[in-house]
Regions:
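Bacterial N-terminal signal peptides that target proteins for export
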Residues: 1-8
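Bacterial N-terminal signal peptides
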Residues: 9-18
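N-terminal periplasmic/intermembrane-space "pro-region" immediately following the signal or transit peptide
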Residues: 22-126
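Outer membrane beta-barrel
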Residues: 97-254, 266-269, 273-284, 316-317, ...
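Sequence/structural signature of outer-membrane beta-barrel proteins
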Residues: 121-123, 164, 177-181, 206-208, ...
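Detector for outer-membrane/organellar transmembrane beta-barrel domains
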Residues: 278-391, 395-396
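Outer-membrane beta-barrel "beta-signal"
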Residues: 405, 430-443
Length: 443
């Protein structure tokens, strides 16, 4: 009996330490497991941070130019017919960050936009357009003369309103500058947009408002149609990358009457416009056109009707980093209608015909750094018709350098401009200009 007690005592003495060892081992296993899980979590966090950094770098490389919400200084128009103009600071379907010029009322967002721009211009040769560089106004009679001009007429003020109507974005946009007579406020844009319908005044459907060269000069090159007018536009997207738009727009052709004949120009039908655009991640290609009809009614005799029209091929491609190459080609009888020129003129027999015009624009925009950029563009145009229009050829060349500051809300720039005008009797006029500008965008 005593021996059994001794055996039991020995067993108990052995089991107690073994139990403690087992418990200690289990605790050690739990600690090791926790350490393994923590290490795995650290690895996941590291991988997630790497992904976030990579996304930030990608976004920075793919970003637009500084101040992109206020586009290339002299343009604005509905992006692809579905969004607000690039340079108008109009609210988009997603609410922009709050700023002193952005406020809301319920579900409606209001954005006051625009900028102040000072232009300092020096002409080394005579030219009729002192505020813009228009080769059509270059004299060919050998006139000499210099001119210095400082103005702020391009300064803009806009109001964009966005809100939901039946769970769809409804947009209103108003914009003006001071290019009216005697620096008066001038309406540029005033339109409403809901789903596929846009009504009001804005850039014509015929033009490519997303491919207007980024010149400091307000005029822009010759192949880019540049018209804002009253219109009704329908837009649809057949696929994710394609867009179709059709417009009925104000017609405003300029007609040169036959020699010695007095009368008036009648706008018998509107301009019918259309565009097709294909877009991918690096740029877009657009084909657009317009057709219309105008009439000259002499004070005595029968009226003459003339059909006018034109086509535009436009392309823009992001080449390296933020650099962009772009080109436009336009052609048509009566194309001058969209560049402030003559649409119809009489031939040698006095019969009224459309003036046939073709133009080309090619340019490259380069970013030297996040704050420094340059743009160079060349644009010739030819008047093909042998009509009463005395002009035969125009050239427009521009090269500039910009520096962005104030957190990309302002820039200073310097631009050189060269222009040529040549007439059918082989007379020529040349113009050289230096233009400096300072622009401050609204917050």
């Amino acid at each position: 009996m005593k021996s059994r007690k001794i055996v039991l005592a020995v067993l108990l003495a052995l089991l107690v330490p073994m139990g403690a060892l087992a418990q200690s081992a289990a605790q050690e296993l739990d600690v090791n497991e926790l350490q393994r899980q923590l290490q795995e979590m650290r690895s996941q966090i590291t991988r997630m941070q790497s992904c976030i950094d990579e996304l930030k770098r990608a976004n920075a490389n793919a970003g637009t130019s500084p101040g992109a919400e206020l586009v290339p200084q002299n343009q604005s128009g509905p992006s692809q017919g579905l969004t607000s103009p690039p340079d108008k600071s109009a609210p988009s379907s997603t609410s922009p960050p709050k700023s002193p010029t952005t406020f809301s009322s319920g579900a409606w967002l209001f954005k006051i936009g625009g900028y102040i721009k000072l232009d300092m211009i020096h002409d080394f040769n005579a030219i009729g357009s002192t505020d813009t560089f228009n080769p059509r106004t270059i004299p060919v009679d050998g006139s000499q003369g210099m001119n210095t001009r400082i103005h702020a007429r391009e300064t803009r003020l806009s109001l964009g309103i966005t809100g939901p109507v039946n769970d769809r974005d409804f947009k209103l946009f108003f914009e003006g500058d001071f290019y009216g007579t005697n620096n008066a406020f001038r309406l540029r844009h005033a339109y409403a947009q809901y789903r596929f319908l846009l009504v009001g005044q804005t850039w014509s459907t015929f033009m490519d408002e997303e491919n207007i060269p980024n010149t400091i000069d307000f005029e822009t090159p010759l192949a880019a149609p540049l018209v804002r007018q009253g219109l009704l536009r329908l837009t649809t997207k057949p696929s994710k990358r394609t867009l179709l738009a059709f417009g009925v727009e104000e017609s405003d052709p300029e007609v040169v009457p036959p020699p010695g004949v007095a009368g008036k120009t009648e706008k018998t039908v509107p301009d019918f416009t259309g565009r097709f655009r294909y877009t991918n991640g690096r740029g877009h290609v657009q084909l657009s056109g317009f057709v219309s009809r105008t009439r000259f009614r002499p004070n005595t005799g029968d009226p003459t009707d003339v059909t006018i029209g034109g086509v535009l091929v436009s392309a823009r491609y992001r080449s390296f980093g933020r650099d962009t190459v772009y080109a436009q080609f336009s052609y048509g009888p009566g194309l001058g209608r969209y560049r402030g020129d003559v649409s119809a003129a009489p031939d040698a027999s006095g019969k009224l015909k459309a003036v046939e015009v073709t133009a080309l624009t090619a340019g490259y925009e380069h970013y030297w750094s996040p704050r420094w950029s340059s743009n160079i563009v060349a644009s010739p145009a030819w008047v093909l018709s042998h009509l009463a229009d005395p002009n035969r050829r125009f050239d427009y060349v521009a090269a500039n350098l910009r520096y962005w500051f104030l957190e990309n809300r302002g820039w200073a720039g310097l631009e050189y401009l060269y222009g040529l005008r040549e007439t059918r009797n082989e007379m020529q006029g040349h113009a050289n200009r230096i233009q400096a500008a300072l622009r401050i965008n609204f917050p």
